[in-house]
Amino acid sequence: MTKAQLFGKPLADDVTRGVRAALKEWAGAEPGFQPHLVSVLASEDEASRVYVHSKARQAERLGVRFTARDLGADAKQDELHAVLQALSADADVHGVVLELPLAPGLDADAALRHIAPCKDVEGLTPANLALIAAGREAEALLPPTPRSVRFLLREVLGDDLRGRRVAVIGPGRTVGRPLTFMLNNRGVTVTLCNECTRDLRDVLAPQDAVVVAVGHAGLLRPEQVQPHHVVIDAGINVTPGGVVGDAVPDLPVRAQTPVPGGVGPLTSALMYQNLVRAVKLQRGERVE
């Protein structure tokens, strides 16, 4: 059995309090002002719809204006670019999210280039990722899911992650790739794995933690982990029985994030923290 369940809600609550404080301050100074977040869908991906519904619920609780633009799975690349460019140019829109993955045939890398970096609350535009890769995180909007993973690792391993060894399974655009740089920026030795990695048990054995973010239910199994491991499950898979992660539940490890309830709540809170930061960047205000 898992020795510790690592829940994201306590950390998410702390972040949300800061977001509420910023929104309250704006409401007092500018009655009627609401930051506006727009989520753009161009696929039939069920996991993306789960994320959108979660964002909408959180926006309603916070008092943030939220709009979902569903272009459908048959959207054309030029149409997607035009929508993202229009949202980026709209002064009434403060944050833009492109829900990934896109429908087959659509180029996510090309589409992300059409989101203004200062409205990129998911931190996935080339400009923000370049700052992260260069170790200039203070100037960027950081991707919320990798940032959630780093927060949760610190909860168990301590604030100083220097010298720790972490395996990241899944070199994806939204989690694995940016997380690799973000952990490296904190002095972590990162081993990047994928679904084709051979002898995964041996690769994982010396690691302090394992982060899995592939989108493959049951990918990480009991025979592949060690009792000293901290497992952060950033996978999301929609099954007939509900939403599950990439790791088998209740692994025999030191600590494990459940799905749902682990990475997800903190990711949502950090995205809205990014929205606050984005508003300040767009207004030319000082950003901490």
Swiss-Prot record:
Keywords: Amino-acid biosynthesis, Histidine biosynthesis, Hydrolase, Methionine biosynthesis, Multifunctional enzyme, NADP, One-carbon metabolism, Oxidoreductase, Purine biosynthesis. It catalyses: (6R)-5,10-methylene-5,6,7,8-tetrahydrofolate + NADP(+) = (6R)-5,10-methenyltetrahydrofolate + NADPH; (6R)-5,10-methenyltetrahydrofolate + H2O = (6R)-10-formyltetrahydrofolate + H(+). The keyword Protease does not apply. GO terms for molecular function: methenyltetrahydrofolate cyclohydrolase activity; methylenetetrahydrofolate dehydrogenase (NADP+) activity. CDD domains: NAD_bind_m-THF_DH_Cyclohyd (cd01080). Pathway: One-carbon metabolism; tetrahydrofolate interconversion. GO terms for biological process: L-histidine biosynthetic process; methionine biosynthetic process; purine nucleotide biosynthetic process; tetrahydrofolate interconversion. Homodimer. Belongs to the tetrahydrofolate dehydrogenase/cyclohydrolase family. This is Bifunctional protein FolD 1. It comes from Deinococcus geothermalis (strain DSM 11300 / CIP 105573 / AG-3a). The lineage of its organism: Bacteria, Thermotogati, Deinococcota, Deinococci, Deinococcales. The gene is folD1.
